Amino acid sequence: MFKIQLLTRYRSICLFSLAAMILPMAATAAAEARRPNVLLIYTDDQGSIDVNCYGAKDLITPNMDALAASGVKFTQFYSAAPVCSPSRAALMTGRYPQRAGLSHNASSARGGTGMPTQQVTMAEMLKAAGYATAHIGKWHMGYVDEQMPRAQGFDYTFGHMGGCIDNYSHFFYWQGPNRHDLWRQGKEVWHDGEFFPDLMVAEASAFIQQHRDEPWFIYWPINTPHYP
């Protein structure tokens, strides 16, 4: 009888120990499963009155309207700044532009400084959480290596570093001198004649396919409807 009781107790201890090991593993697996992919679409120089779902009558925005219909539509929301660079710095850091260190538009010339590297971006936070991270599109938060996307938490980057480009030549045409501005992973690339938003779609699709077995974050700041 004593041996049976001892064996029963031993089995109970083993089962408890096994459960103690399995439950945290299951909780971790569940947490892993709950990490959603994140696609952050950021349009350029577009106001709320430039979308049908907010009352616009002089243009057609079916895809944006579909996103609004299937998601959440804010009726009271304010951008942190009315111009490009500070609003992007605020979005990336969750801070007021002044606290993020970029309260004005960064220079669109190579060597122009922008948001300080010490600022912590959402890309850095998501990367630390195990996400594959990509910037695809417009940057405009600094045109020096230590302030460009790969130094701000992005594993992969494709796009233009300055404020705007022509969609086909990918040249910057604003107050001169005209200059080419298209980069992939910190290296200048040429896709003359190809429509930039289409290139963005192709780059995002390839990144998603490459990282289909892990959580990913794509910051997709399209350069439209901004000039030119």
Regions found by a protein language model. Name each.
Residues F2, R11, F16, A20-I22, ...:
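Formylglycine-dependent sulfatase
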